[in-house]
């Protein structure tokens, strides 16, 4: 045998010895702690993988020795179920499967992998399952004597469930407690609803009513302030409008005659008198509009001496509506009221309305002046004859046939068809 072949044999023997030395794992002694450090699992797997890599050069005795060593480790792990880690065995089995798939070997290695897989399943089912690295500890790991209790598959798998179940039971108990407390409170409220609750409601109602009265008083004061403010602004515009109207001769007389309803109260002489009307003012009595004061300003005319005629409406001491008017100082031979005393149409004349204080509740003229003529006299001044007749027909249609003026006949005078 040559020296080269001797060197090869010696190197193989050395490699075989190294592989055996690194692949051998000493079992843990009986007095070892019950909870091995997870770093030992990692170092054990790394040593086994290193041994397999170093033993990869030979396919003979080295593979068999490594397989035997792994089998012996599996048997020792099966004997020490509470002490070993099932996850480590699964990792070694997975490594063997991966190595076998990457590098197919003899049939003996494949059968060993199958045996390891079967042993691993058995160990994972009946043995212990080690806690993975950096995983949280579940439950109390120490026994009654203060020593660490072994973690079995049952305790590791059921530990969180038992704790969760305990919490659910605790939550259910808490729920029952809250429901019972709510029922007790409801019963107490039902039992306590009696005269004391009614008295409290009355006190609350009185407080709310008092607040409403205070709010209404504040609203009234605010309304009065706004009425004064905008009344002054409105008065400025009204004065400006009156000044402009005075520069238009016969403006108010024409507006009276063009109004479809006011024109029915005017005869030919009254239309002549109203032609001297140069200004009209409507003054509201009080901020609450409790009455009206209508002022008619006339130029010098051949009918009466008054420069202003006033018709006033207001509330009397007992609350009824009363009216007052200025006595008209008629010139001789031009007293329209005395000339029309025997005429039944006197009540439908303008000056008959001015001096009459009996039919106040059904006073139509003051309503027309306050609500239609005074707010916008320009629209009636600009009405033509055709537009005035058309507008009068529209108003009569809205009022209905019952409100149309009835024709009156003088006694002893018969009407002919």
Curated annotation (Swiss-Prot):
Compositionally biased intervals (Basic residues): 1-25
Short name of any one Pfam family annotated for the protein: NAP
Biased composition regions of type Polar residues, renumbered to the chain: 406-417
Keywords in alphabetical order: Growth regulation
Keyword GTP-binding belongs to the record: no
Gene Ontology biological process: cellular response to gamma radiation; nucleosome assembly; positive regulation of cell population proliferation; positive regulation of phosphatidylinositol 3-kinase/protein kinase B signal transduction; positive regulation of protein ubiquitination
Ranges of Basic and acidic residues composition bias in the record: 27-37, 182-191
InterPro entries xrefs: NAP-like_sf, NAP_family
Low complexity bias: start-end ranges: 93-103
Listed GO CC annotations: chromatin; nucleus
Gene Ontology MF: a single term: histone binding
Domain of life: Eukaryota
Annotated region (Disordered), positions in chain: 1-55, 93-112, 127-202, 391-417
Keyword Endoplasmic reticulum applies: no
Oligomeric and partner information: Interacts with USP7.
Entry's family note: Belongs to the nucleosome assembly protein (NAP) family.
Function: Involved in modulation of cell growth and cellular response to gamma radiation probably via regulation of the Akt signaling pathway. Involved in regulation of p53/TP53. Suppresses p53/TP53 protein levels and promotes its ubiquitination; the function is dependent on USP7 and independent on MDM2. Proposed to displace p53/TP53 from interaction with USP7.
Name listed for the protein in its UniProt record: Testis-specific Y-encoded-like protein 5
Gene: TSPYL5
């Amino acid at each position: 045998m040559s020296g080269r072949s001797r060197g090869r044999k010696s190197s193989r023997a050395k490699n075989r010895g190294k592989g055996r030395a690194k692949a051998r794992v000493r079992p843990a002694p009986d007095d070892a702690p019950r909870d091995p450090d997870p770093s030992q699992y990692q170092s054990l797997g790394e040593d086994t993988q290193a041994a397999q890599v170093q033993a990869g050069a030979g396919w003979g005795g080295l593979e068999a020795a490594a397989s035997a060593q792994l089998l012996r480790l599996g048997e020792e792990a099966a004997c020490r179920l509470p002490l070993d880690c099932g996850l480590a065995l699964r990792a070694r089995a997975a490594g063997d499967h991966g190595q076998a798939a990457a590098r197919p070997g003899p049939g003996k290695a494949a059968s060993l992998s199958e045996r390891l897989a079967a042993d691993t399943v058995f160990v994972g089912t009946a043995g212990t399952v080690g806690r993975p690295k950096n995983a949280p500890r579940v439950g109390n790991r120490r026994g009654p004597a203060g020593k660490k209790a072994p973690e079995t598959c049952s305790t590791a798998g059921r530990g969180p469930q038992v704790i969760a179940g305990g919490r659910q039971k605790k939550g259910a108990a808490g729920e029952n407690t809250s429901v019972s407390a709510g029922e007790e409170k409801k019963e107490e409220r039902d039992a306590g609803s009696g005269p004391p609750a009614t008295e409290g409601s009355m006190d609350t109602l009185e407080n709310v009513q008092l607040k409403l009265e205070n709010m209404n008083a504040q609203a009234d004061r605010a309304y009065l302030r706004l009425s004064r403010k905008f009344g002054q602004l409105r008065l400025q515009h009204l004065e400006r409008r009156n000044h402009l109207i005075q520069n238009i001769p016969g403006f108010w007389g024409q507006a009276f005659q063009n109004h479809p309803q006011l024109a029915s109260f005017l005869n030919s002489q009254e239309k002549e008198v109203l032609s001297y009307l140069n200004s009209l003012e409507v003054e509201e009595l009080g901020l609450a509009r409790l009455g009206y004061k209508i002022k008619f300003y006339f130029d010098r005319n051949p009918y009466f001496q008054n420069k202003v005629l006033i018709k006033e409406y207001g509330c009397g001491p007992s609350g009824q509506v009363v009216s007052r008017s200025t006595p008209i100082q008629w010139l001789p031979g031009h007293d329209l009221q005395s000339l029309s005393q025997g005429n039944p149409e006197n009540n439908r004349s303008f000056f008959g309305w001015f001096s009459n204080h009996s039919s106040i509740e059904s006073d139509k003229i003051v309503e027309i002046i306050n609500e239609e003529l005074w707010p916008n006299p320009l629209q009636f001044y600009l009405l033509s004859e055709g537009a005035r007749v058309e507008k009068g027909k529209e108003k009569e249609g809205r009022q209905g046939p019952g409100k149309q003026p009835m024709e009156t006949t003088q006694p002893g005078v018969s009407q002919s068809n």
